[in-house]
Amino acid sequence: MAISFKDLEKKIKSREIDTVLVALSDMQGRLVGKRVTGKAFLDYVHKETHFCNYLYTVDMDMYTVPGFKSSSWETGYGDMTVIPDHQTIKELPWLEKTALVLGDAFEHDGKTPVAHSTRQVLREAIAKANKMGFEPMLGSELEFFLFKQSYEEIHSNHYKNLKETSWYIEDYMIFQTSKEEVFNQELRNSLLDSGIYVECTKGEAAPGQQEINVVFTDALNMADNHILIKNAAKEIAYKHNKAVTFMAKYNKEVCGSS
């Protein structure tokens, strides 16, 4: 569930929570960060922590990409200051005794926002819309493929011969998605319990393709939720020895995911 800092403090002191994920989104929309002990979070990390500034300049495989002014071998790959946004604290039911808080990235001085950080880019866009008299509201409809194999199996097979969880188009098909309900039910309920207002899941237009729909909210909150939904789907799939992909087009022979 979404909880306040005071609620988190109580849960840490009572040992209901012992780990706090302090994270932000990289340029690929993935959660990156640290697992912080509850004690350290309460003592000082709730105010600030530090991440390497290369996190906004890596590729999909986490290799550093040359040519960036903000982060490079020449500049020594320094740290940026990450200040946890206490409005984003959530308890994560699918991870034992774990909470999450997203952070805003600042330069090492702790005062200047990292201009190219994902949350800052969105904050500036929202501010421009507000000046024009608009309040951006967003709702996520994520599509993804669910596979029978685990991530390890898929990797060891060099990402060939992937086996979707169903064998014919399952768009709106109840029987097809009933076979996948062990995964989808946990995903829906876990996200709902974490404070993300999930409306539904359904089959989509290809074998093994899933869709999850989330009720709209303000743009920044939805962007934060969108990242967490993807991460939760991957982690819950892993628990069930399955795998998911949100790739726009993982296979040229089947339809893509939006």
Which ranges hold each PLM region?
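ATP/Mg2+-dependent ligation/transfer catalytic cores
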Residues: M1-C200, M222, L228
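Acidic, glycine-rich loop-and-beta core segments that form the ion-binding/anion-interacting portion
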Residues: Q209, V214, M222-S258
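Active-site-proximal loop/short-helix segments
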Residues: F147-E164, Y197-T217, A248-S258
